UniProtKB/Swiss-Prot annotation:
Biological source species: Thermotoga maritima (strain ATCC 43589 / DSM 3109 / JCM 10099 / NBRC 100826 / MSB8)
Quaternary structure (record): Homodecamer; pentamer of dimers.
Active-site annotation: 178
PANTHER family, alphabetized: 3-METHYL-2-OXOBUTANOATE HYDROXYMETHYLTRANSFERASE
Entry cofactors: Mg(2+)
Function as written in the Swiss-Prot or TrEMBL entry: Catalyzes the reversible reaction in which hydroxymethyl group from 5,10-methylenetetrahydrofolate is transferred onto alpha-ketoisovalerate to form ketopantoate.
Protein's name according to its UniProt entry: 3-methyl-2-oxobutanoate hydroxymethyltransferase
Annotated positions binding Mg(2+): 41, 80, 111
NCBIfam families documented for this protein: panB, PRK00311.1
Family: Belongs to the PanB family.
Pathway connected to this protein: Cofactor biosynthesis; (R)-pantothenate biosynthesis; (R)-pantoate from 3-methyl-2-oxobutanoate: step 1/2
Gene Ontology annotations for the cellular component aspect, listed alphabetically: cytoplasm
């Protein structure tokens, strides 16, 4: 997969993107035939225990992007630019985005609308592919006053349309639409020549993205309305750990099968 192939999928084949934060998850995503792996700053609230994405640092993101690359070396990987890694200056943004490519990302994702058009252009001119992200942009949640659905007012609808066109004009190869009302997401998708990838934005985007922990049911305390739980791995893992605990307590594990003697043959994997 590459940028040009993704762009050609618009209107022909739906794009499938998932988040992944480590090597084993990335390998599974690759083996499942997922088109794009996003190392999201959702790392913060899904893996690192933060309340939201704002505390996530460049250093943390770089570690996880590199891990994902090792797990799926031939996958198309997009790295989220975390809060304040690109907002302070164009020069700093180019430097930080370049760091992601150096550890294995194929592109970066930037939250924000038309006001970031010049920055997107500079990144693209520097050889860094950019995926845009408009609608609900979690890094700006304090400005929005919460996680609110976007595109409900005419003013907001016009802003989103302008932003999508500006990002396309400046060289973005795709745009994530997050929590945008379905009608507006459809209008945006039809108004730009680059793919839109929806999350909570209805049926008419060119692709869909979900968060790893949401679609696999790894968080029993949180289930966003727009997501679908394709498995309940929290319960699967919980039961496995409970069984391991039970067997150890009762002396049922390890057995002879899992033990070595001076007559054992072969290595640890035999």
């Amino acid at each position: 997969m590459n940028v040009e192939k993704l762009k050609k999928m618009k209107g022909k084949e739906k794009i499938v993107m998932v988040t992944a934060y480590d090597a084993p998850s990335a390998r599974i995503a690759r083996d499942a035939g997922i088109d794009v792996i996003l190392v999201g700053d959702s790392l913060g609230n899904n893996v690192l225990g933060y309340e939201n994405t704002i505390p996530v640092t460049m250093e943390e993101m770089l570690i996880h992007v590199a891990a994902v690359k090792r797990g799926a070396p031939d996958a198309f990987i997009v790295a989220d630019m975390p809060f304040l890694s690109y907002q302070t200056s164009v020069e700093k943004a180019v430097e930080n985005a370049g760091k992601f490519l150096k550890v294995g990302a194929n592109a970066v994702k930037i939250e924000g609308g038309e006001e970031f058009g010049e920055l997107v252009q500079k990144l693209v001119e520097s050889g860094i592919p950019v995926m845009g992200h408009i609608g609900l942009t979690p890094q700006f949640v304090n400005r929005f006053g919460g996680y609110r659905v976007q595109g409900k007012t005419e003013k907001n609808r016009e802003y989103l349309l302008r932003s999508a066109r500006e990002l396309e004009k400046r060289g973005a190869f795709a745009i994530v639409l997050e929590l945008v009302v379905e009608e507006v997401a459809k209008e945006i998708t039809e108004s730009v020549s680059i793919p839109t990838i929806g999350i909570g934005s209805g049926r008419f985007c060119d692709g869909q993205v979900l968060v790893w922990h949401d679609l696999l049911g790894l968080n029993p305390d949180f289930a966003p309305r727009f997501s679908k739980k394709y498995a309940n791995l929290y319960e699967v893992i919980l039961k496995a750990l409970q069984e391991f605990r039970r067997e150890v307590k009762k002396g049922l594990f390890p057995t002879e099968e899992h033990s070595f003697t001076d007559k054992s043959k072969g290595g640890v994997s035999s």
